[in-house]
């Protein structure tokens, strides 16, 4: 049943690897409909394993414009075999999480150094102590210096992480070229601080350096959409970009409505059309494979009841079928409410999933 569905309507695929214990489960989801077209437990997650599954999906009509995935080498190498000309955009979530982890580590280091300094000051203030002050004072001075340095590093890293998240990798941001300049600035700042913590800061800097084009690929897609909106609505491009940037502000803030009024005055009756088009363009430009993580959270309640995945192909296939044919009771995306992922993807209705399994039509409820 899962293999009979035509996948040609999928334009953006989200790929990731989830795990049950130490066993990888390869997953692929349509970014628009959340239709899960790949859910397979395998012994390996290397290039050949991914390539075999993606080639099978290609035979079923899957030819996405691009995919979104993390920096996994096996996943990306497998895609190169299946779709040599299909771009694989970077997943911004993982690099942001890695940066946030580094910030938290240095925040804990700074907090620990402060605790040591406060303990030593308490010891020095004790009138009953019986020791020389000279050694303790030297130690206290060293702790003051270490604490100041640790807090400074933590603050610097936190600032860089916020810039990366809110100014560079955010949907509501500048054009791609400007993002690249800001991205390179952050990498350069990390390089200047790398000597302070080579293993951790160095690893993050290298990851950012190697993934720049993949992580910022979404910005190129968004730029093209905004350019198309400006041409269609016949409005200056900078006003369309300003409309995009206005999405940064909460609609409960004064600055949001001030910006809203300025743009409305500049574009007149076209503003509402442009606003709706920009909102739709931003909503249809994925930057991460987080929907796979969402699928993982739904699967987890089932996976935790099993210590292994023996017979996993059939069992996971049934779960995949259930998730693809169960209708959404509610959703933030209005077009999904009351429809199943398959119905959203294909545009055609289907019977209840129990009926599709051959269990007959649903019986009316008896009062």
Predicted regions located by residue number:
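C-terminal domain-tail junction helix/linker
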Residues: 155-158, 162, 166, 170, ...
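RNase H-like polynucleotidyl transferase catalytic core
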Residues: 86-103, 272-288
